[in-house]
């Protein structure tokens, strides 16, 4: 009987490696009100959770089949996080362009954009330090922060699996074509 290898589905994904600081501080933290997109798909709004070595949660599970396919084909998949989906890129840049006076950049991001905690941590973890000096680059990063995922979590951690007996090996009544009478 034809069988496809089992693969995790509705699962979390590992990143190439969080820094120890980020992992220690934010593992288990929910990332709320965020959008995520693969390059070829529209973004989805929701939330996910930072894990010690990656990400998981409903927003990740919704794209898990597409992410898994990208990893299988290319060895990695890059998703883009919109940390402020309720604001346009122009609105974000306008708020970043406001004078911050003696406030630190962290306080400016918090007071102008409400960007703090795990979302601010993601921005620092996944961005080159140079973008923080340029409001246009910073606004682009906030609206499309690249996160590279390198592998699915193991089968025993997945909510469900893909693979097994393919539909083309069965009749419309779900009987195995090679073994008549076996459903």
Predicted feature descriptions by range:
Residues 26, 35-181:
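Residue-level recognition of phosphate/Mg2+-coordinating polar/acidic sites
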